[in-house]
């Protein structure tokens, strides 16, 4: 076993159970471990939603228990400039972005890594993400693999990492299943053992999304229409809706043509007219896509894919893998054709590609290729 005692690891301590157990495991493995707590959002007056102070207290308690030093850093300015402004601009453009992916790219594995490197003299950083690393024996570049716990795997959120970042990052809980992580935390008497997982977007926390968004983007109400142009109801703003969405349309009791009582789903956003197009039934052809065009590509190996390739793709988190074919357009854009039509492919979200357990990388969905019935 290699001697880890000369290697310094800076663990991103969030105040949650995963980072707590990560710090414990690395200490057990003999590393010199220190924690770093990031504050990425300046609190507003919504104190009941903002858990930063509570998270910091929990992170400090865990570090005290483990006997490691906790550093603190404020990345709120970087977060605003590199994550939040993009998030708003995408919503303004009628798309549905994923800020957690951008946060990993710009903050956790860029600003954090640079600070750990330059100020704290780290050999590695570590996070409580459920992914694994693989170092091929032939000396090839390191790969990122799905986490062992398929239900918690977070490789979808980390596809923007390069092989250099993968080589510098440790993911101790990626080798474990979640119940085991909680069991370790409990055994070690860590205050975070029973703390529930955070579910909200990092800067919104658990507060109501529509309320939060309306503070920054003025809502423009408009019509909800059927594909034939019949007005079905009103929406409060296109930005509050995403393709394939069923809840929140408030037209549930409305029957369609021929007394159709199936539920309504968002099929399209007509930005020019500020109209939401809704259709009935989850199998409606307008909800289906044959594929997608993706841009802003990131490949873990850094080499663009230049040949047609069979693999699988996820177009949203916790989705079953979709068998597909990648057809390169150029180094910046690819066409992806699904083996079978897929529903709720959403521009602005990420398409992430896999071969087996290996995460190849991904890109932003620019547009979907609409389903055409044979």
From Swiss-Prot:
Alphabetized, the UniProt keywords read:
ATP-binding, Cytoplasm, Disulfide bond, Nucleotide-binding, RNA-binding, Transferase, tRNA processing, tRNA-binding
Q: Which SUPFAM superfamilies match?
A: Adenine nucleotide alpha hydrolases-like (SSF52402)
Pfam families per the UniProt record, alphabetical? tRNA_Me_trans, tRNA_Me_trans_C, tRNA_Me_trans_M
Q: What are the boundaries of the region Interaction with target base in tRNA? A: 98-100
Stretches the record annotates as Interaction with tRNA: 152-154, 316-317
Please give the Gene Ontology molecular function terms for this protein.
ATP binding; tRNA binding; tRNA-uridine 2-sulfurtransferase activity
Question: What InterPro entries does the annotation carry?
Answer: MnmA-like (IPR004506), MnmA-like_C (IPR046885), MnmA-like_central (IPR046884), MnmA-like_central_sf (IPR023382), Rossmann-like_a/b/a_fold (IPR014729)
The entry's protein name is tRNA-specific 2-thiouridylase MnmA
Positions annotated to bind ATP: 12-19, 38, 128
Organism the protein comes from? Vibrio vulnificus (strain YJ016)
BP GO annotations? tRNA wobble position uridine thiolation
EC number(s) reported in the record: 2.8.1.13
Q: Mention any one GO cellular component term assigned to this protein in its UniProt record.
A: cytoplasm
Which cysteine-cysteine pairs are annotated as disulfide bonds in the entry? 103-202
- Name the job this protein performs: Catalyzes the 2-thiolation of uridine at the wobble position (U34) of tRNA, leading to the formation of s(2)U34.
Site (Interaction with tRNA): which residue positions? 129, 349
Q: Where in the cell is it found?
A: Cytoplasm
């Amino acid at each position: 076993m290699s001697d880890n005692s000369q290697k310094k690891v800076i663990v991103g301590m969030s105040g949650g159970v995963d980072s707590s157990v990560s710090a414990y495991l690395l200490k057990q493995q003999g590393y010199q471990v220190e924690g770093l707590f990031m504050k990425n959002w300046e609190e507003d007056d919504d104190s009941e939603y903002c858990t930063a102070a509570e998270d910091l207290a929990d992170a400090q308690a865990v570090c005290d228990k483990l006997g490691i030093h906790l550093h603190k850093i404020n990345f709120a300015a970087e977060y605003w400039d590199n994550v939040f402004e993009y998030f708003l601009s995408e919503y303004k453009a009628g798309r549905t972005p994923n800020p957690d992916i951008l946060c990993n790219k710009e903050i956790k594995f860029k600003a954090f890594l640079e600070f750990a490197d330059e100020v704290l003299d780290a050999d590695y950083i570590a996070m409580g993400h459920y992914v694994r690393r693989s170092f091929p024996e032939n000396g090839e570049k390191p790969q990122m693999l799905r986490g062992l716990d398929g239900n918690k795997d977070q490789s979808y959120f980390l596809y923007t990492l390069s092989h250099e970042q993968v080589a510098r990052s440790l993911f101790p809980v990626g080798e474990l299943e979640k119940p085991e992580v909680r069991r370790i935390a409990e055994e070690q008497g860590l205050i975070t053992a029973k703390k529930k997982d955070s579910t909200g977007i990092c800067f919104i926390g658990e507060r109501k999304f529509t309320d939060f968004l309306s503070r920054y983007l003025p809502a423009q109400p408009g019509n909800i229409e059927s594909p034939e142009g019949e007005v079905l109801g009103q929406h409060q703003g296109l930005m509050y809706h995403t393709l394939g969405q069923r809840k929140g349309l408030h037209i549930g009791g409305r029957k369609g043509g021929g007394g159709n009582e199936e539920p309504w789903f968002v099929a399209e956003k007509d930005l020019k007219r500020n109209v939401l197009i809704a259709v009935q039934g989850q199998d409606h052809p307008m909800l289906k896509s044959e594929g997608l065009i993706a841009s802003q590509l990131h490949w873990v190996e850094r080499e663009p894919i230049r040949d047609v390739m069979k693999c699988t793709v996820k177009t949203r988190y916790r989705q079953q893998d979709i068998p597909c074919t990648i057809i390169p357009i150029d180094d910046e854009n690819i066409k992806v054709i699904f083996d079978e039509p897929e529903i709720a492919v959403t521009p602005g979200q990420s398409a992430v590609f896999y071969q087996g357990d290996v995460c190849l990388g991904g890109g932003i969905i620019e547009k979907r290729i609409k389903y055409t019935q044979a």
